[in-house]
């Protein structure tokens, strides 16, 4: 029910936008997860450069512009539930990024297409082993390069290689797939969710959106009758003076939630005003705004 693409070298997102262009033309019977890895932060203002060069991608670029992309090191998950897409951006050194991914079901790879001499860290044995281990049993890959040592390295790390015609002035490129192994099925068919508050409702929604049958149980006769049933809900990030992991997690969580609720519940981000109700809070507000 979900197809996962991994890309080494996300850049400005041209491959993602092209994938999105194709995705919008098809009937979406399953979900798409797109994992993009790059050591540089995606700057939304740079998308105009792509729009000038690739005007046919205008619609897709506008979709990405509308998302609240934070742009920071680490993981960032951008949900587009109406399109059945999750874009997971990982802004880290390539070795750390692949080490931090904890799934092993990536179905297709866009491998770095630049001259391997310019990006040797993208083609080490450790990286290619990680790509193999993170791949599903039927995983495939493509790359713009066709250098002999890259062909051999991919082959030595478990991939079947094929050299095919390239694009434009490029004579050849490489495609391939993971060498066959016994396929294991871990498909979940049906899930019971107990509770219809914010957590239970969100879990049920995401499971159903993944084409999984859901049974919902609650002691009350309607949704969110417990502590989640308040008439008004506010959402805001918990700011910290330290750029530590907890702070990054809270900021990422806020923007993920903002994207999600805007696209599912018509959430209106009206803003909140904090007053310095005591000396401690006044000092905290002053430091945050400095």
Where in this protein do the model-derived segments appear?
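Glycine-rich FAD pyrophosphate-binding loop
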Residues: 209-229
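Class I S-adenosyl-L-methionine
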Residues: 146-187
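N-terminal Rossmann-like FAD-binding beta1-loop-alpha1 element of flavoenzymes
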Residues: 188-215
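SAM cofactor-binding core of SAM-dependent methyltransferases
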Residues: 3-67
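Dinucleotide-binding Rossmann-like beta1-alpha1 core, especially the glycine-rich loop
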Residues: 232-290
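S-adenosyl-L-methionine
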Residues: 49-101
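A short glycine-rich, Lys/Arg-flanked "PGG" loop and its adjoining helix->strand segment in the class I
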Residues: 124-137
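Conserved beta-strand signature within the Rossmann-like core of class I S-adenosyl-L-methionine
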Residues: 138-145
